[in-house]
Amino acid sequence: MFSRVIFCTFLILPLLAAATAIPRTNPPAPTCTTGSLQCCNSVQAASNPVVGLLAGLLGIVLGPITGQVGLTCSPITVIGVGGTSCSAQTVCCNGNSFNGLIVVGCSPVNISL
């Protein structure tokens, strides 16, 4: 009698284990609530001489900037729709964009697009 109980227990336990839900951890969505997501080929400090030279050639006065400066950027509108991809640095920028050549007030966002 006990052998049947033990046999049924060992038969049912794997089925219960297989039916147990597996918790999924989805990566957090990128947070860029204060600006816009940009895909920049390069992200530099505002004090970098290359940034100052490029800004000077374009006639842009940078002034005091918080964050970093994105160079050669394009906006990312909707993630996952229409083949949006960024093979460079994804940043969240809350400053001015000068035709995508220079975008000020950027901070890196760790997402994979």
Swiss-Prot record:
Superkingdom per UniProt: Eukaryota
Signal peptide (residue range): 1-21
Iron recorded as keyword: no
Gene Ontology CC terms: extracellular region; fungal-type cell wall
Positions of disulphide bridges: C32-C92, C39-C86, C40-C73, C93-C106
One Pfam family recorded for the sequence: Hydrophobin
Tissue localization of expression: Expressionn is switched off in the fruiting bodies but abundantly expressed in the vegetative mycelium of both monokaryon and dikaryon.
Molecular-function GO terms, alphabetical: structural constituent of cell wall
InterPro entries: Hydrophobin
UniProt KW Cell membrane keyword: no
SMART domains from the UniProt entry: HYDRO
Subcellular localization, as worded in the UniProt entry: Secreted; Secreted, Cell wall
Predominant cellular place of this UniProt entry's protein: secreted
Keyword terms of this UniProt record: Cell wall, Disulfide bond, Glycoprotein, Secreted, Signal
Sugar-modified residues: N110
Entry's family note: Belongs to the fungal hydrophobin family.
Quaternary state and interactors: Self-assembles to form functional amyloid fibrils called rodlets. Self-assembly into fibrillar rodlets occurs spontaneously at hydrophobic:hydrophilic interfaces and the rodlets further associate laterally to form amphipathic monolayers.
Function statement: Aerial growth, conidiation, and dispersal of filamentous fungi in the environment rely upon a capability of their secreting small amphipathic proteins called hydrophobins (HPBs) with low sequence identity. Class I can self-assemble into an outermost layer of rodlet bundles on aerial cell surfaces, conferring cellular hydrophobicity that supports fungal growth, development and dispersal; whereas Class II form highly ordered films at water-air interfaces through intermolecular interactions but contribute nothing to the rodlet structure.
The protein's name in its UniProt record: Class I hydrophobin POH3
Organism: Pleurotus ostreatus (Oyster mushroom)
Encoding gene (name): POH3
